[in-house]
């Protein structure tokens, strides 16, 4: 099986939904950055600004019963999995109404009813978990698959390759999506990885891999749809490396001095939201007024999330003793 781009193209409604989804994620993350600067969000906080086309395309392709697991850069993933933004922001602000009851924070977001299994703070630790979720689907005889996200920094972790081996050996229905934003904290892929074509990392296990432009919603939609079909039909793992870019630092405490302003601006010129907006207008899928209305509705969602979170209580002391399993 080879992914030959051009097989699938989004329809009008999917373009419009993706525009709204990506814009919501952008505005939500911008607000998180603002609240962090004001001291309303504590701890670590990793923003997804610039990478929105990746999760938006996966959300379009993913079926309701498919599961997802990702790293600590997880705000966008849980929102598109179906969690209301207000419960995500409440979690970031440490409120009892948060999706993890105010105890997980930015890096440990969970929504099991929506098949979202985290948010994991240890680099690469989610990969064995995603592999296990795929094992459960196969064991239970479902036709569901697991989308397991990891960053370019995680590809050098030993547990990732143990998981790859098990997935190939047992024929597990998992799509490994490597979100290659070029920097593992402040270390570039070129400085940390000999094999820089990360989609080839599974070759020694017989796992097929492909590379996609993660800044291009149309290419992501096409490639992810074909990948999901392959995994679902063959019950075999597959690796997708998506070349993307984060506009902000690794986390809120990272000034990102290891890259130039010119480099960042080069990627911003390919901004996925700007591009999909252009496609929508050029094809008359929606008018300028329609898009302005979407933009206003997104502002209202973010505003509601802030008001809800600010007015939510902090967790009770009793919560220190709940959900403890070890």
Curated annotation (Swiss-Prot):
Stretches that traverse the bilayer: none
EC number(s) given by UniProt: 1.2.4.1
Keyword Oxidoreductase: yes
Species whose genome carries this gene: Rickettsia bellii (strain RML369-C)
This protein's UniProt keywords: Oxidoreductase, Pyruvate, Thiamine pyrophosphate
GO cellular component terms attached to this protein's record: intracellular membrane-bounded organelle
Pfam families per the UniProt record, alphabetical: E1_dh (PF00676)
Protein's job: The pyruvate dehydrogenase complex catalyzes the overall conversion of pyruvate to acetyl-CoA and CO(2). It contains multiple copies of three enzymatic components: pyruvate dehydrogenase (E1), dihydrolipoamide acetyltransferase (E2) and lipoamide dehydrogenase (E3).
Signal peptide segment: none
An example Gene Ontology biological process: pyruvate decarboxylation to acetyl-CoA
GO terms of molecular function: pyruvate dehydrogenase (acetyl-transferring) activity
SUPFAM superfamilies: Thiamin diphosphate-binding fold (THDP-binding)
UniProt-listed PANTHER family: PYRUVATE DEHYDROGENASE E1 COMPONENT SUBUNIT ALPHA, PYRUVATE DEHYDROGENASE E1 COMPONENT, ALPHA SUBUNIT BACTERIAL AND ORGANELLAR
Subunit comment: Heterodimer of an alpha and a beta chain.
Name listed for the protein in its UniProt record: Pyruvate dehydrogenase E1 component subunit alpha
Catalytic EC class: oxidoreductase
Cofactor: thiamine diphosphate
